[in-house]
Amino acid sequence: MALLQISEPGDSPAPHQRKLAVGIDLGTTNSLVAAVRSSVPEVLADAQGQVLLPSAVRYLDGGAVRIGREALLEQARDPLNTIVSVKRFMGRSAADAAASGAPYEFVDAPGMVRLRTVQGDLSPVEVSAQILAVLRQRAEDVLGDDLVGAVITVPAYFDDAQRQATRDAARLAGLNVLRLLNEPTAAAIAYGLDQAAEGIYAVYDLGGGTFDISILRLTQGVFEVIATGGDTALGGDDFDSAIVAHACAGEDVAALPVADRRALLVAARAAREALTDQAQAPFEVTLRDGRAIQATLTRAQFEQLAEPLVGRTLDSARRALRDAGLAVGDVRGVVMVGGATRMPVVRQQVGALFGTEPLTNLDPDQVVALGAALQANLLAGNRALGEDWLLLDVIPLSLGLETMGGLVERIIPRNSTIPVARAQEFTTFKDGQTAMSVHVVQGERDLVSDCRSLARFELRGIPPMVAGAARIRVTFQVDADGLLSVTAREQSTGVEAAVAVKPSYGLSDDEIARMLADSVTQADSDARARMLREQQVEARQLVESVGAALAADGDLLDPAERATVDQRLQAAAQAQSLDDVEAVRAAVQALSDATEEFAARRMDRSIRSALAGRKLDELA
């Protein structure tokens, strides 16, 4: 497959100077590291031959830490100090984390939730760094040298806060992040090289804790993500919880000790995985009070439990297709990613929706890491002939800024391919204005109050001018990792201010879904609200300019004219607070009509003043 290259700045190394770079799939349930060896991507195993590293960290009294399989085996015995599925808490607040029902003690802290352990309060970034450090050491042991960097995969629906948290975890682990790569895109790289196929593809990624659906167009080596969707709080863990609720019907599971709840989830996962190949599976747990919970779960029962969860993923898939302007029949194939896609009920329902057998010839647990390894190899400069491609990911929600009246000016629309930079010019609202506040927002609605605030900063040092004369260019840049920076620059002086957007915590899936749904259902009311705000802003501008003109040249009006203008001016000032767009428009028009002759007289005076004392030949 002939592909095009987007490469990082810098000189290309000589052929013999091969640099070691890896791809890392930092997963909710398991994590992996892969590298390209002898031009072939492969997942790297530990000393025991295991390629999957359970994403589990246990903190012991005295400072010792257990990571991976050893920690996983001890989670039922020490649940509060054994952190699993930490990816769910990346970039989240304490309220978000507590709502997940996870059996931990959450501590709210500035910026991000922390988890209380015997070694103190730890952030998800610190826990994730422990997992990444093990993978880094494994790679260096297997490859025999230090790494120049890593490509780390993230769910496509991760927002700025969650992506930044992932980067921070990598830095703590001593890793140089070459790029954050969306998991579906990584899978497309792996499958694209094997299949050499063009057309529309869906990547269905159901992991331990997150779900992503991406619609990609593959054309002559260009991987373009044309729409994304998903659920950052839905994965295999939720199927396990459904099994527990079924097996423990009549039992108040939430009231059980943490260790019992963890043991129930472990048994549920074992049953779910057994049902992949068997018609039924046992569910047996002995609680700490000696009671035994025993049940036999059939595949038919499990499919009934799983149906609403799988249905949520299919709803996301339909929304992504609508966003891309495509029908189900336009999709040529479906790539399955994530260990949870091994469930027969998932494969059956996905196949039924798209009318085609899902692609499963690559290990769904490994495909993301393999694609990340290929991308890391390229970014490190180790490319061979024909090993280049162009990656085009998209942003999930529109980015914009607040304008007068609390309106949103959309700068980068959702589903724009990244990296992307867009700029727009704005001006001042008042005469002599020397500063401007820039409020960056995210969302699909027309009013700032209905969108999510991302950042605020001020541009100072604007030269005093009449309103509307200054030119301020605001530039939005989203890099290849999906991280946003905003710059405001006054054009005549070059004075500049900027901000790198790092929200305090991420959007929940419910918030994302609500923002997208509201943009459709509230479209008419948003349009009416926008018209009203725009008319109110126009009224305010006219009232201020007429007031300034009267103060400067009020003597140009006779008493009757002045009385009329004052009356219309007062009416327009009062109209600014009205909720009737037609009433505001009428008041603006009335004031404009009343001051038309006044404006002409002011212009005449200005011209006479400019020409006073000057000779005709001086004007030639």
Swiss-Prot record:
A molecular-function term among this protein's GO annotations: ATP binding
Keywords: ATP-binding, Chaperone, Nucleotide-binding
Gene3D superfamilies documented for this protein: 1.20.1270.10, 3.30.420.40, Actin, Chain A, domain 4 (3.90.640.10), Substrate Binding Domain Of DNAk, Chain A, domain 1 (2.60.34.10)
Keyword Metal-binding: no
UniProt record, GO biological process: iron-sulfur cluster assembly
HAMAP family (UniProt xref): HscA
Family membership noted in the UniProt record: Belongs to the heat shock protein 70 family.
Function according to Swiss-Prot or TrEMBL: Chaperone involved in the maturation of iron-sulfur cluster-containing proteins. Has a low intrinsic ATPase activity which is markedly stimulated by HscB.
Protein name in UniProt: Chaperone protein HscA homolog
